[in-house]
């Protein structure tokens, strides 16, 4: 049981770190023809990330930014709640609050990544002729899977 809790804790920390990286890094879509990438915040060309996004004023992008930031917040809150429950909760109880908070994080990642996929990652809306998904986009979807698994495991596990 202790090994399982430690493994879940490590995956939860990895999820928090990957959420930070995927939200902050400007590599959601990468151009195949030129050395350029686009993120949630900036457009990077040849290593220079000083240019803003041409569609930065759109509500869909602002929603993606908001949901990704909310997912980070809920993931960190869930981690703090888990550590608190680990030391204060009576034996035999389940980690309901940690699990519920992590599932809210999962929902925020789902909404944010889905909006970005629909609006910007299909190739029609970005400024590149040929492009592919960057590591930030892929990390966001990996965090989607991890946060769901961690949230469900928190709901199922009991403290022994």
UniProtKB/Swiss-Prot annotation:
It is a multi-pass membrane protein. Most abundant in squamous epithelia. Glycans are attached at residues 35, 43. InterPro entries: EMP_1, PMP-22/EMP/MP20-like, PMP22/EMP/MP20/Claudin, PMP22_EMP_MP20. It comes from the Eukaryota. Coiled coil: none annotated. One of its GO terms (cellular component) is plasma membrane. Keywords: Glycoprotein, Membrane, Transmembrane, Transmembrane helix. Belongs to the PMP-22/EMP/MP20 family. This is Epithelial membrane protein 1. The lineage of its organism: Eukaryota, Metazoa, Chordata, Craniata, Vertebrata. The gene is EMP1.
């Amino acid at each position: 049981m202790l090994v399982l809790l430690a493994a879940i804790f490590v995956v939860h920390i990895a999820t928090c770190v990957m959420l930070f990286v995927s939200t902050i890094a400007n590599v959601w879509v990468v151009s195949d023809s030129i050395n350029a990438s686009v993120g949630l915040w900036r457009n990077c060309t040849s290593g220079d990330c000083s240019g803003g996004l041409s569609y930065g004023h759109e509500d869909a992008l602002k929603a993606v930014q908001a949901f990704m930031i909310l997912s980070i917040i809920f993931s960190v809150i869930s981690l703090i709640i888990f550590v608190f429950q680990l030391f204060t909760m009576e034996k035999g109880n389940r980690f309901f609050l940690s699990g519920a908070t992590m599932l809210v994080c999962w929902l925020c990642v789902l909404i944010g990544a889905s909006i970005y996929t629909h609006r910007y990652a299909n190739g029609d809306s970005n400024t590149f002729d040929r492009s592919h998904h960057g590591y930030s986009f892929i990390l966001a979807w990996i965090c989607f899977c991890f946060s769901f698994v961690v949230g469900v495991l928190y709901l199922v596990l009991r403290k022994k």
